[in-house]
Structure formats: structure tokens, C-alpha cells
Amino acid sequence: MIWEHRTLKRRRLRDLPPVDAVAPIDDGDPVPDRLVPLGYEKKDTAGSLGLLVGSIVVGFALDGLYRRVHGFMFRHRVSNIGSHRGSILSAMIVWDFLYYWNHRWMHEVRLFWADHVAHHSGRRYNLSTALRQTWSGVLTTWVYWPMSLLGYRYSTFLKARQLNLLYQYWIHTEAIDRLPEPIEKIFNTPSHHRVHHGANKQYIDKNYGGILIIWDRFFKTFEPEIRQVQYGLTKNIRTNNPVKMAYGEFVNIAKDVVSADNLNDRLKYVFAGPGWQPDTIRPEPAFS
């Protein structure tokens, strides 16, 4: 944190303002605290830590279920590629590819977005932002089942997941500008991930990769960091309560489903994009 503070203090402001931001700064935005590092805010950081603690508790509670599901899939594996020498490297690549699609669907399907919105809810972008982890990841664990079918053991599966999460921790910072071009071309970097957390129109639904950015380049979801990033949601939830951040969107979905006039609308409120509304031809997502 101190390193981030010193780096940000030295850095000059970017030349281009966020003229296309869709979540303009207002009186409700968090105010920096003089006694905490630059770029941090006490309530924002406390909310991030609360989400981390909840995520760890939920993870421990569901670990037995995850192991049983993996064991069943592993016994019915169609390949033993995961047992070969160097399997951890291939596991990391396979995990990252599946992570790209998992992450993308989290932004494109409202039910999955409800699982992910807490991570994007902060209007600060710093290392504590990476701690905003899901409490309902069970909704999308099926995305990674192919790894079990390919013959990756549960221990290898966990290592690939943990290394992916660890890599993504350091890219949640404004203190690192662009890295050398070869790195920016292949890997996810702080610059690329700042774009992903942006509420600017041009940054919405971009840069889903975990470790590698090549998936975004290949599937046409890549966007470079050009203008200053406006962090948060297009409609900020204005709370640092971990429970509200973790489950608030599920409550909103339930309210919309109850108020819907027909089955088709009810299903779309759950499975269409986050910003879907009845009779909307090309909806704007609530945030991606």
C-alpha cells in the first residue's frame, strides 16, 4: 500500500479526461482519508476485507462438495493428459481459458453477474479490490469440470486456481503503468485490468482474461487503456456492507421476477444481460 501511495503521488495526471464515462463523479463518491495510503479509503477497504472473509468461509464450507463432484468427474475422465509431466503448466493454461469464458458469462448473464458484481462495486482501484471475492461461486464451478474429465487431479486443479488468483492480485493497482510491449501483448497487466474495471462506455465488457490477454485478442473483447478509467458500476450500489454487496443483486433479480408480467420476461430477468428490460431491443448492460 505504501509503495502504491508513493508511486501514485509521483505520477502525473493523464492527458485525456474520462469524457465518455457513464458513471460520473458525484457527491456520493468516496473521499480519500489523510491517514491511509493514496488511492485507498477506509470503508472501501473494510468492505473488500469483509468480502474476502466471507468468501473463505463459504469456500471451506463447500470444499467437501467440490471434492466429491471432482472425484466423480475424474473417475469418468476421457483423458489422462493431466497426469503427464508438466501437467501444472498445461493445467494453468486450460484453467485460464475456461476462466475467460466463466468471467465473460459473469458479465453477460444476469444470474452470474449477481455472483460477480461485488468485485466491481468498489469505486477505488487498488490491491484491496482484488480481495472482493464471490460468496456464490458455486453457480459457475461447472465451467471448470472439463479439467476433471481431462484427467487433472484435484490437487493440480487447486494449484492452477490458486496461481491464477495470485497472479491477478498484483494487477489491481494504478501504481503500475504500461509494461513493455511483448508483455502487454500476451499477458493480462494492470493497464488491461484497469480497463476491465472501468464504467466508461468503451471499456464495458472488455478484457476478461485472467493471466493471459491473448483470449481477449482472439475473441475480439480486447480494449487498450486510452482514457482515464472511471471505476465502479454504471449505477453504483453505494454500500460497503459485505452482505449487501454479495447478495444485493440476487434480491434485485427476485424483485424483477416477481413484478414481471409473463414467463418470458421472468426468464430474461434471470438469464439475459444485466441491463435487460422488457421491450428493450438493444439493452445497455448494468455493468460489464
What function would you assign to each model-found segment?
Residues 53-54, 58-62, 81-232:
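Membrane-embedded catalytic scaffold of the fatty acid hydroxylase/desaturase
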Residues 76:
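Beta-strand-enriched accessory nucleic-acid recognition/scaffold domains that flank the catalytic cores
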Residues 1-73, 84-100:
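Specific transmembrane helices
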Residues 6-31, 37, 124-128, 170-288:
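Cytosolic/stromal cytosol-facing helical appendages immediately following the last transmembrane segment
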